[in-house]
């Protein structure tokens, strides 16, 4: 692949940020199934849209309908799933978007690989640290029940490990407080970090 050369864009990161009125970033929501990642990311997306900011939500289930529909849930397939999503998120970041990625992404090494794809401060890890007992009691898709019955093997949190972030930029337990206050915490972080205007 020595013949493949990266094409440099004529538009810079700072020019895209100036046009959009905010900096791009990847907010990576990680946590157990049922933790509230997609709900929280979706509510943040709605708030950013209300403010006239440019964002897009990449959801774990949705990408498996297209981009990653050929992948299963083996360790290798999970790694490839996160690699692909990381590359897509990087492209969206390059376009100047606030990319909201909601994936269980149970392995710390894979999340760190995505972080390494982008510049300093462009990857914001949001650990949705809702306890397993709460996630299992919610069980919106019936997955925990199936995993406990042995119908799903290698299910994160039950028969497969989840490696919690060591130093996430934000930690939110969705069983504490309400959705509005949790979104406000995310927005405050983005404002204080200079990603979006107040």
From Swiss-Prot:
GO terms for molecular function: adenylylsulfate kinase activity; ATP binding. It is an enzyme of class 2 (transferase). ATP binds at residues 31-38. GO terms for biological process: hydrogen sulfide biosynthetic process; sulfate assimilation. Its EC number is 2.7.1.25. Keywords: ATP-binding, Kinase, Nucleotide-binding, Phosphoprotein, Transferase. Pathway: Sulfur metabolism; hydrogen sulfide biosynthesis; sulfite from sulfate: step 2/3. InterPro entries: APS_kinase (IPR002891), P-loop_NTPase (IPR027417). The active site is at residue 105. It catalyses: adenosine 5'-phosphosulfate + ATP = 3'-phosphoadenylyl sulfate + ADP + H(+). Catalyzes the synthesis of activated sulfate. Belongs to the APS kinase family. This is Adenylyl-sulfate kinase. It comes from Shewanella amazonensis (strain ATCC BAA-1098 / SB2B).
């Amino acid at each position: 692949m020595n013949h493949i050369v990266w094409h440099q864009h004529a538009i810079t990161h700072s020019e895209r940020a100036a046009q959009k009125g905010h900096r791009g970033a990847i907010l990576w929501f990680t946590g157990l199934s049922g933790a509230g990642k997609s709900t929280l990311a979706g509510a943040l997306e709605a708030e950013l849209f209300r403010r006239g900011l440019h964002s897009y939500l990449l959801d774990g289930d949705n990408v498996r309908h297209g981009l990653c529909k050929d992948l299963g849930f083996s360790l290798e397939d999970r790694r490839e799933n996160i690699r692909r999503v990381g590359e897509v998120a990087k492209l969206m970041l390059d376009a100047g978007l606030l990319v909201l990625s909601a994936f269980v992404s149970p392995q710390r090494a894979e999340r760190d690989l995505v972080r390494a794809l982008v510049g300093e401060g462009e990857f914001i890890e949001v650990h949705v640290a809702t306890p397993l007992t709460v996630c299992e009691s919610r069980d919106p898709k019936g997955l925990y029940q199936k995993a406990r019955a042995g119908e799903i093997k290698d299910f994160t949190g039950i028969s497969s490990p989840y490696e919690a972030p060591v130093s996430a930029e934000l930690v939110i337990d969705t069983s504490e407080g309400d959705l509005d206050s949790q979104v406000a915490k995310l927005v405050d972080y983005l404002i204080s970090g200079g990603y979006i205007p107040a």
